[in-house]
Amino acid sequence: MTEIYVDADACPVKDEAVKVAERHGLTVHIVSNSGMRPTGHPLVKQVVVPAGPDVADDWIAERAGPQDIVITGDIPLAARALEKGAAALGHDGRPFTQDSIGMALAMRDLMRELRETGQSKGGGPAFSKEDRSRFLRSLEDTVQAIRRRPPP
């Protein structure tokens, strides 16, 4: 059965993920290293992991499998999800794929180096309504595609 894993720290689309999951009766694991407001939603499993680098990522990567979806802005976690056969979506709805993950990791490393050397300041554009809409469409499309696949 497909499950959705949300890397929840700084994730702007948690509510949207729950809406899509609810439409399909899917469990959503919202994983964070800080406290969250309880949702009380029967399909939502809120997981608070200890603080520390990559603890939430490790929790998700250990559990996600071939029929699952990982929602994250963390490119290394997306790469780990793809290695396990899971689908991976960014917060803006752009899918990470085997074909795109290498370039995404390289760009991440380049941007980090530019920030560290002072050649670049800060992040990208603000999260927009278009990003939110793209995310909803992409997650819906991903759920539908997984449901059409034969089980592993």
Curated annotation (Swiss-Prot):
Stretches with biased composition (Basic and acidic residues): 128-140
Region described as Disordered: 114-152
Matches recorded under InterPro entries: UPF0178 (IPR003791)
Superkingdom per UniProt: Bacteria
Pfam families: DUF188
Annotated family: Belongs to the UPF0178 family.
Protein name in UniProt: UPF0178 protein Plav_1521
Organism in which the protein naturally occurs: Parvibaculum lavamentivorans (strain DS-1 / DSM 13023 / NCIMB 13966)
